[in-house]
């Protein structure tokens, strides 16, 4: 961590909607000087809202889907690592989130996975019972 705070990379699913959890996890990591995210809806958008509410610098890294097609996601993940995060805060997500966590670990960046009750119960995924 730099003297003036952490550089935190946030990743997670586009359908992740637990604003309170995102805010609580980021609040617990103080001091934060920058939040790096992929500029997608879901976890990324919630992290950006946190930045605005706390007056913390955001570093959005949007994927260039139109230009690069399927390669855009992994390219965006590499670009986010280029911001030299101190840690990755990973909320539940899919392949893109898994790719980001894998790349971060290979780069020696600490990854903190934020579990949900559904994930802890083994019900994460498309065939999960929505009543849980």
For the regions a language model picked out, list residue spans one by one.
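Acidic/glycine-enriched connector segments
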Residues: 2-8, 15-127
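Glycine-rich, aromatic-bearing surface loops/beta-hairpins
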Residues: 131-132
